[in-house]
Structures are given as structure tokens and as C-alpha cells.
């Protein structure tokens, strides 16, 4: 095996770092929160297992596509599949896919962190969280996790993580629906109006309403995700 692989201590260290890093933003408390973290953790472990441990995807594709894409080799540089497929010859860490991944991953972590601040503030006051990211969509933290995973797929796609991503998206969707049923019983009047105005997953600019003096103000009220 190439010296770039079989580095199991790096698999463990990097996996732990990213899992703890996400947890510091997400602050899991309930069983549902831990399921969300568990889904993300499984993705991260699968990612770094191929990045530094055993490059299963490279082995499978090199025999099939090796003659057409000579850069597709069992090396760390060869693991940047998008670069191999588009023929990028420069530093793989400076490719368009790699740079885009930084923005998507960073945006995902930012969304998780900012959403938690608004969620925590609302919980402290016994209110429904509908300010900040929650004014744009009902489940910003789940979307944040999906953005982080999508960013890693831009940077280092593998067969296992590509297969896992849609499955994890369904897992988060089911968690969101379960959560909404619970929230609806706690914040019945507010939730019905909030759910009517704010989309579940796709961000939408908050509606604006006219006040008594005809000035325009954001229409928001201030539950995890």
C-alpha cells in the first residue's frame, strides 16, 4: 500500500477532531440530537478511512478508468477524484473543487453555530426559535450538517460517502418531521403560523409586514431546528 495510506492514527485523530468540532457548535442534548451527531460521525469516519486508511474507491475505479485517467492512482494526490476526472494538473489543494469545498464546509459549520445561539436564547425564555437562521428555514442545523458533508464530497468524494449522503439526508428529514410533531404540541398556535410562513429546508427570505405607521419590518416571532 502507498505510504499515503494505512495511516490509521490519522484516521482516528482527524475523525475525532471533526466530530468534536461539530459537537462544540451543535451542543447535542436529546436522544434525537445524538442521532443527528451519530449520522454525521459515521460519514466523517467513512471519509477519513478512505482518505488516510484504505482507498477502496481508488482501487475500484483505477482498474475501470485507469487507462483513461492515468492520475487515478492509489496516492493521496490521486484521491482527489474530481481533479483527476477534469484533468487538473496543479496543486490539488488549490483546485476549484477544493476551494469551493472550503466555502461550503465553513458555511455549514457557521450555520450550525449561529442557529444554536438563537435556539439557545429562545429555549432560555421558553419561546419558539424563529429568529436568525430560523427566520429563513425551520431546520438550519440539519441543513448545516448536510452542507458540511456536501463540502467534503466536493473535496474528497468516495463511493461509500456518495452512497451515504442521500441516506443521511433522509435520516435528517425523518428527524425533522419527528421534531416538528413534538414542537407542534408545545407551541401549537405559534408553530402553525411559523410553519405556514417558513419553509422546512430551503431558505427563503423572511416575509415583511406593515406596521401601524406603515413602516416595513421583518415578520418574525422568536425547538431545535
What are these regions (language model features)?
Residues 1-130, 148-225:
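Membrane-anchoring alpha-helices and their flanking helix-loop junctions
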Residues 133:
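Short alpha-helical H-box segment flanking the phosphoacceptor histidine in two-component systems
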Residues 136-143:
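Histidine-centered phosphotransfer motif of kinases
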Amino acid at each position: 500500500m502507498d505510504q499515503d495510506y494505512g495511516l490509521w492514527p490519522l484516521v482516528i485523530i482527524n475523525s475525532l477532531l471533526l466530530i468534536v468540532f461539530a459537537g462544540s457548535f451543535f451542543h447535542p442534548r436529546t436522544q434525537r440530537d445524538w442521532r443527528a451527531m451519530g449520522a454525521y460521525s459515521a460519514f466523517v469516519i467513512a471519509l477519513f478511512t478512505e482518505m488516510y486508511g484504505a482507498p477502496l474507491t481508488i482501487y475500484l475505479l483505477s482498474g475501470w478508468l485507469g487507462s483513461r485517467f492515468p492520475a487515478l492512482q492509489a496516492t493521496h494526490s490521486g484521491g482527489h477524484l474530481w481533479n483527476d476526472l477534469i484533468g487538473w494538473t496543479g496543486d490539488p489543494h488549490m483546485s476549484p473543487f477544493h476551494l469551493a469545498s472550503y466555502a461550503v464546509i465553513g458555511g455549514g459549520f457557521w450555520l450550525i453555530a449561529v442557529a444554536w445561539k438563537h435556539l439557545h436564547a429562545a429555549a432560555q425564555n421558553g419561546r419558539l426559535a424563529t429568529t436568525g437562521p430560523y427566520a429563513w428555514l425551520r431546520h438550519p442545523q440539519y441543513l448545516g450538517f448536510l452542507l458540511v458533508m456536501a463540502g467534503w464530497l466536493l473535496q474528497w468524494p468516495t463511493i461509500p460517502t456518495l452512497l451515504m449522503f442521500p441516506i443521511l439526508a433522509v435520516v435528517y428529514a425523518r428527524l425533522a418531521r419527528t421534531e416538528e410533531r413534538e414542537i407542534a404540541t408545545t407551541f401549537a398556535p405559534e408553530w402553525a403560523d411559523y410553519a405556514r410562513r417558513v419553509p422546512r429546508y430551503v431558505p427563503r427570505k423572511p416575509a415583511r409586514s406593515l406596521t401601524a405607521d406603515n413602516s416595513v419590518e421583518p415578520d418574525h416571532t422568536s425547538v431545535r431546528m
